[in-house]
Amino acid sequence: PTRIFTLNRVELQREGTIHPTQKPVKLYEWVLSLFARKGMKILDTHAGSASSLVACQRIGGLDYVGFEINEKYYTAANRRLEEEKAQMRLFDLLEEQEKAAQTTLF
């Protein structure tokens, strides 16, 4: 079977790139959804802009580590990943509210 994944380069340009060979996070989300399972450890030995690590963070349930030799990209990737971690997801927020409501019932 053939699988075709269409990438929107305009979306990547809109997000802004920090690395010359930066891949879209959606590409990594797609690959990881096919091959990674909850609890797996993901290693990116050439993290670059940290797109793979951002995808792991968004998917959740994956341990991940990345290496980057270039200090400029390392710093930018760290900043990008920290910004991603700081984002509250709607479903996470709803889950937290649900848990809070359940604990106040008893």
Question: Where in the sequence are the language-model features?
Answer:
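Class I S-adenosyl-L-methionine
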Residues: 1-106
